[in-house]
Amino acid sequence: MHSFDELIQRSTAFSLQALEKAQGEVLDALQTSSATPLVKALQMIQLQKAISAVGMFSMFDAMLRDDLACSDGFRRAGELLEERNNVELKDRFMSFQLAINVLKHGRGRSYDTLVQKAGGLPFRITLTDEAFFAEGDVSEVATLIEVDDEFVRNCANVITEVAMALRNVAANGLE
């Protein structure tokens, strides 16, 4: 694999820094005005984080398909990780994969699987009886997964770890 994992780290840091700067400017403006466009700007910033997370996973899937010469890059990567007894990484990767599916498709099998594991996930998911992550937070957008800076960074981190593990598999001729 080429340096996608390095680029995704840099891209994520750059994007989050730019979004943090924009959010700071909007929050400053909200000190003197509660105009709807300012609230919408906060929501747009939150939505952009979700778009970044979904996009990085989609691009990683395409790379895996090419590099592993398969039709389901995520499944093959999981198999290779499991074959090398890297089950913790495989499980974490799968949790983020499922979260991305929930962001893309909403409630369904992926959501149901995550709800069953809600207490042990490295991110928050709204449960069936919850409407918000933080009631009164005007920046919150309707996603079933809480997509904050940590979630986006963790997406980039798990992609990097999986890419490095797969490079080690390929380097050792263990494919």
Where do the protein language model's features map onto the residues?
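Charged/polar positions within long, soluble alpha-helices
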Residues: 20, 61-72, 98-115, 164, ...
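Short, contiguous, well-structured surface segments enriched in hydrophobic/aromatic residues
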Residues: 43-77
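Short, mixed-charge amphipathic alpha-helical segments
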Residues: 76-118
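Extended intrinsically disordered or low-complexity regions, especially N/C-terminal cytosolic tails and loops
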Residues: 1-55, 87-91, 98, 115-175
